[in-house]
Amino acid sequence: MAAVVQQNDLVFEFASNVMEDERQLGDPAIFPAVIVEHVPGADILNSYAGLACVEEPNDMITESSLDVAEEEIIDDDDDDITLTVEASCHDGDETIETIEAAEALLNMDSPGPMLDEKRINNNIFSSPEDDMVVAPVTHVSVTLDGIPEVMETQQVQEKYADSPGASSPEQPKRKKGRKTKPPRPDSPATTPNISVKKKNKDGKGNTIYLWEFLLALLQDKATCPKYIKWTQREKGIFKLVDSKAVSRLWGKHKNKPDMNYETMGRALRYYYQRGILAKVEGQRLVYQFKEMPKDLIYINDEDPSSSIESSDPSLSSSATSNRNQTSRSRVSSSPGVKGGATTVLKPGNSKAAKPKDPVEVAQPSEVLRTVQPTQSPYPTQLFRTVHVVQPVQAVPEGEAARTSTMQDETLNSSVQSIRTIQAPTQVPVVVSPRNQQLHTVTLQTVPLTTVIASTDPSAGTGSQKFILQAIPSSQPMTVLKENVMLQSQKAGSPPSIVLGPAQVQQVLTSNVQTICNGTVSVASSPSFSATAPVVTFSPRSSQLVAHPPGTVITSVIKTQETKTLTQEVEKKESEDHLKENTEKTEQQPQPYVMVVSSSNGFTSQVAMKQNELLEPNSF
């Protein structure tokens, strides 16, 4: 008797020749070994259930075709009972032999109705789809001692390997998103066309809040002075100049064309509770940011250009301190000239020429704007010139030494600018005849903080000159001017160089490249004569005046008629080099050579610009 069930049902196969009563069926000694397995081709076995196998081949059951084959012979009184236990076959060539062996087992009668019911249920509930399911083959063996042995073998079916679509997972369906509505066109007359860029906030999306929107408007040139502006920038107080326009901009950003100030005001009141904004009491449409973010772009009302300022108080107060220092550094003209003291700033230290009259001095890095004289009938131009101010000489009323600041709007566009030249403080200059030893003249530059303003250059003051003091030096020199004639006014007086306006311009302007770029090594000797030659550059024909110690060279405002362009220098004099008891010897006019030493770091990258128009925003 043989019965076949599908998948997880047990299959009992046994053979017997003598089964007469139920006692023998219930006795476990009659069935020494039982195999329980899953048959892969159950539908084929069911179709062959009614066929009879007449002859069996001799090699139907062999060790080569079966994985496990056990044979047990039990001696009985009547016949010998032979029980064959098979395992599943794994070779494709022996499948037919396995089917024939199964047919022989199916032809036997069933000893009981229980297995027949399982067979009927299997035929009813089985389907072709169930046949496709691959289940592991389980071998259960029961020995005579009652010890069960279980072995499970995985079986792969070719149908599943051939179908790639079964293993591939199903593709997820696309979710239908909500279509965004196109924005409604706004009238350019009622709603300004202002676009606010959205900022990504660490993956939180592109949502921009109302307070961020207001900050963006405050940093936009098209909206800041017109629709919204700062009233107290340091405290974060701003005012909605045109509340309707701001609300329309917010509605355009939120795609709500019916937005008004009342609706936007409710959102602003929500920020009161959050501690972001506050309403300034007593002022309409004025609000305050509780915390100001850093690196805001502030729009200046007077200047259309914007400047990035930090909210750090130390940095934001730098501009205010500079303005205060500039206002404190105003020098009165009348007491300074009558007292005989002229304020001159040095780059190294901030000391006046005479400490008897203390004056508050600004930093050398500041550039002060020069007030135009009211008596000037034409625009005044600033040139790089030098002017000698006598300490004991009274200045007429026409001249006034003043330094002040003025607004950018009041500056005339024709006013020339004064550029600070990054040069060393000591510029040695050598004046010596060709056949004599060289002597150096040290000049010191003057910062552009004190400007002597003259209304009429032809007023009765001394001529404009350079005073160069000779000191010894043994350093490399740069040729400044050759064939300079020294003329002596009288016997015993220091020789002076007298040049016309064209010669002064040629010396001090055409030789700028020579001073900045080229250096010529000239042998010099530390020894020099007792008479220190004083070089005087006279722009126009006027009487030369002897200058006692303490003479100061500063800059002066020249008119358009004057063509002399020079550097602003300050003469550094030493009383040890000026001897009153000079030898009374007549000196013949002979050519001199003027050279400039580059020993004190006189860089070749000095850029000297002249006649540059002063822009209102240059300061």
UniProtKB/Swiss-Prot annotation:
The modification Phosphoserine is found at S110, S163, S167, S168, S187, S432. In fetal tissues, it is highly expressed in heart, lung liver and kidney, and weakly expressed in brain. In adult, it is highly expressed in pancreas, spleen, thymus and peripheral blood leukocytes, expressed at moderate levels in heart, placenta, lung, liver, skeletal muscle, kidney, prostate, ovary, small intestine and colon, and weakly expressed in brain and testis. SUPFAM superfamilies: Winged helix' DNA-binding domain (SSF46785). The keyword Nucleus applies. It comes from Homo sapiens (Human). Residues 208-290 bind DNA. GO terms for cellular component: chromatin; nucleoplasm; nucleus. Binds to the underphosphorylated form of RB. May interact with other transcription factors in order to regulate specific genes. Interacts with RUNX1. GO terms for biological process: cell differentiation; negative regulation of T cell receptor signaling pathway; positive regulation of DNA-templated transcription; positive regulation of transcription by RNA polymerase II; regulation of cytokine production; regulation of transcription by RNA polymerase II. Residues 568-586 have a biased composition (Basic and acidic residues). Residues 173-182 have a biased composition (Basic residues). Residues 305-321 have a biased composition (Low complexity). Belongs to the ETS family. This is ETS-related transcription factor Elf-1. The keyword Phosphoprotein applies. Keywords: Activator, DNA-binding, Nucleus, Phosphoprotein, Transcription, Transcription regulation.
